Amino acid sequence: MGRELQKKKNRSGNNKIKHKPKSKRINPLGNAIIAANWRQDETLTQNYRRLGLTSRLNTVTGGIEKKTAGSESKTSTANKLAISNAIPKNFAPTEARVERDPETGKIIRVIHDEKKSNPLNDPLNSDDEDGEGFEGFGDEEGSASKNEIVKMLEEQASRAGEKRERQQSEREKEWIEKLVKRWGENYGAMVRDRRLNPMQQTESDIRRRVQKWKDAGGVVTAEA
């Protein structure tokens, strides 16, 4: 039965949607700072991790590269922020006070230290880390260079791009010249002129364009 359905799909006139692979590719070397510190013998994820960056913003769902022993960083929060639902195999010893009956010596009750309930071992609810400050992401290996690269990228992003003023095209200059030649300074008439103002530009827009045209040295030329 399944084979017959497969044959029917193969005979279907609907073409299968095929995505071009190049449409999904990204250029990791688009930035000069990243390109200068890129290592060709490492993968994209390895390079980004070393530079203190991330290749994806979504949560990791699996298939990540396992780190070698000793490469775990104390400053890394990747494992600290993970919530494990599994029951721990080894329980850490804790201290508690015991109240006994003075006559029989039997234990009446056990008094534990006041501590918030944390059955899922959520580090965000842990009292042990309340006094610790955030120490940043990433590995200790190459942390100095990573911080320098991140600082350079942040400085580059903070610099405002050079703003270039829009230049009027030749056709726009000719259009403004026709308006000024016919109506002079009467901007209201320019707005109502359906022949010279078919796009229904507003009075303030035409006034701004005319002023910019005059500042650039625009003058009405006499017809030959």
Curated annotation (Swiss-Prot):
<keyword id="KW-0690">Ribosome biogenesis</keyword>
<dbReference type="InterPro" id="IPR019002">
    <property type="entry name" value="Ribosome_biogenesis_Nop16"/>
</dbReference>
<comment type="subunit">
    <text>Component of the pre-66S ribosomal particle.</text>
</comment>
<dbReference type="GO" id="GO:0005730">
    <property type="term" value="C:nucleolus"/>
</dbReference>
<dbReference type="GO" id="GO:0030687">
    <property type="term" value="C:preribosome, large subunit precursor"/>
</dbReference>
<feature type="compositionally biased region" description="Acidic residues">
    <location>
        <begin position="125"/>
        <end position="142"/>
    </location>
</feature>
<dbReference type="GO" id="GO:0006364">
    <property type="term" value="P:rRNA processing"/>
</dbReference>
<dbReference type="GO" id="GO:0042273">
    <property type="term" value="P:ribosomal large subunit biogenesis"/>
</dbReference>
<protein>
    <recommendedName>
        <fullName>Nucleolar protein 16</fullName>
    </recommendedName>
</protein>
<comment type="similarity">
    <text>Belongs to the NOP16 family.</text>
</comment>
<feature type="region of interest" description="Disordered">
    <location>
        <begin position="110"/>
        <end position="173"/>
    </location>
</feature>
<dbReference type="Pfam" id="PF09420">
    <property type="entry name" value="Nop16"/>
</dbReference>
<keyword id="KW-0698">rRNA processing</keyword>
<feature type="compositionally biased region" description="Basic and acidic residues">
    <location>
        <begin position="148"/>
        <end position="173"/>
    </location>
</feature>
<keyword id="KW-0687">Ribonucleoprotein</keyword>
<comment type="function">
    <text>Involved in the biogenesis of the 60S ribosomal subunit.</text>
</comment>
<feature type="compositionally biased region" description="Basic residues">
    <location>
        <begin position="8"/>
        <end position="25"/>
    </location>
</feature>
<feature type="region of interest" description="Disordered">
    <location>
        <begin position="1"/>
        <end position="27"/>
    </location>
</feature>
<keyword id="KW-0539">Nucleus</keyword>
